[in-house]
């Protein structure tokens, strides 16, 4: 925090998406550093966060352009997947020991549904669920999505998932549907969730391939603040 203060920022954009960040907020207060806190629960909240940042840095018009572009992309994907009847069931793993996975009030449930799937723990009306290998096996997901927070993909071996004895009869394991994904596209509630959403659609529906990509129109690069 000393280094942050030394930079004399006009604004610090803080987040509460990672446990323990409250201490940083207290330090910002003590040092009288200007800050805002972004803490979106759903993917749709990110557009409002973009607008909030725009107001804070006096870039309201530009922020509205960015937010509108973000929501337009989401709507394009929703329209592509809305008529999918047989939706695969996804298990998202944030952390392996103990197991943590997103519940109903988390952006990854939104991402799952927009991509034409469901979150197997969406019946928990919370943002974060502490579970067990046995409970996951009982829910028998079609796909396992591994997004360990703060862990690089290269450090995660598929065998860490597939060798779990409790999961040997799970559909996802038997069908080799274990996906090691870049956690920055899924675990951070930011505009990059859109990249993760598009990636997820292609993972779940590979037969659509280029046809799916071509329907997600990108007439221009997203505007920047």
Regions found by a protein language model. Give the residues of each.
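N-terminal ligand-binding lobe of clamshell/alpha-beta domains
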Residues: 1-225
């Amino acid at each position: 925090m000393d280094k942050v203060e030394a930079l004399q920022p006009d604004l610090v954009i803080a987040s509460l998406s990672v446990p323990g960040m409250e201490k940083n907020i207290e330090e910002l207060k003590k040092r009288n550093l200007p800050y805002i806190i972004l803490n979106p629960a759903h993917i749709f909240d990110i557009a409002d966060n973009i607008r909030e940042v725009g107001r804070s840095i006096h870039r309201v018009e530009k922020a509205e352009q960015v937010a509108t572009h973000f929501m337009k992309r989401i709507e394009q994907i929703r329209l592509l997947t809305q008529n999918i009847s047989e939706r695969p069931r996804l298990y998202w793993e944030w952390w392996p020991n103990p197991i943590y996975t997103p519940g109903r009030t988390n952006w990854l449930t939104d991402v799952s549904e927009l991509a034409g799937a469901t979150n197997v723990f969406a019946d928990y009306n919370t943002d974060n669920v502490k579970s067990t290998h046995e409970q996951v096996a009982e829910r028998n997901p079609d796909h396992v999505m591994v997004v360990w927070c703060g862990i690089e993909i290269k450090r995660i071996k598929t065998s860490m998932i597939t060798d779990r004895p409790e999961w040997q009869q799970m559909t996802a394991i038997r069908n080799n549907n274990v996906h090691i994904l870049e956690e920055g596209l899924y675990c951070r509630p930011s505009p990059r969730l859109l990249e993760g959403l598009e990636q997820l659609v292609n993972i779940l529906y590979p037969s659509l391939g280029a046809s799916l990509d071509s329907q997600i129109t990108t007439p221009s690069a997203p505007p920047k603040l």
